[in-house]
Amino acid sequence: MAQVELILLQRVEHLGQMGEVVKVKPGYARNFLLPQAKAVRATKQNRERFERERAHLEAQNLKRREEAERVAERVAGLTVTLIRQASDAGSLYGSVTSRDIADACGEASLGITRSQVLLVHPIKTLGLATVRVALHPEVLIDVVVNVARSPEEAEKQARGEAIMREESEYELETGEEVAEGPEQTA
């Protein structure tokens, strides 16, 4: 399959640094890099224009990076709390997505978009989770997400206390045996 040559206008993870000429599949160029203004086609005119504007683009990138580093210092160790409904076993009814985390960070005066939240898979259980947020392609911070059923429960989790009762504790309190799974009959 044919590949397209592009000049990167900014650092793109797993692809290259600003100014590099890279070859990518046409769909990746057409659907992501070109519309997001992360790259331009590597034509003769674009190469010449990029070389003329390189210093300006590098200065802009440096300014954005420094601003992101200042924000990262200000919010180091940020913890956001999300209150969700969950079963007694701790499974959420629904899940916490990158949009939920971005909204919670926005309330904490950290204006980020959901595309900046690097969440591999949605959070589906109560507890603490560490999520990476890309303030700039070169500046990543860790945000602790505290998912709980109530603000009181969130405080307990933040202190490191267990909120889920163990099955053995439940058995001691109630005298009932917790079922392991469906009984099998022969």
From Swiss-Prot:
The keyword Ribosomal protein applies. It comes from the Bacteria. Pfam families: Ribosomal_L9_C (PF03948), Ribosomal_L9_N (PF01281). Keywords: Ribonucleoprotein, Ribosomal protein, RNA-binding, rRNA-binding. InterPro entries: Ribosomal_bL9, Ribosomal_bL9/RNase_H1_N, Ribosomal_bL9_bac/chp, Ribosomal_bL9_C, Ribosomal_bL9_C_sf, Ribosomal_bL9_N, Ribosomal_bL9_N_sf. Residues 151-167 have a biased composition (Basic and acidic residues). Disulfide bonds: none annotated. One of its GO terms (cellular component) is ribonucleoprotein complex. One of its GO terms (biological process) is translation. Coiled coil: none annotated. Residues 151-186 are annotated as: Disordered. One of its GO terms (molecular function) is rRNA binding. Residues 168-180 have a biased composition (Acidic residues). SUPFAM superfamilies: L9 N-domain-like, Ribosomal protein L9 C-domain. The keyword Repeat does not apply. Binds to the 23S rRNA. Belongs to the bacterial ribosomal protein bL9 family. This is Large ribosomal subunit protein bL9. It comes from Acidiphilium cryptum (strain JF-5). The lineage of its organism: Bacteria, Pseudomonadati, Pseudomonadota, Alphaproteobacteria, Acetobacterales.
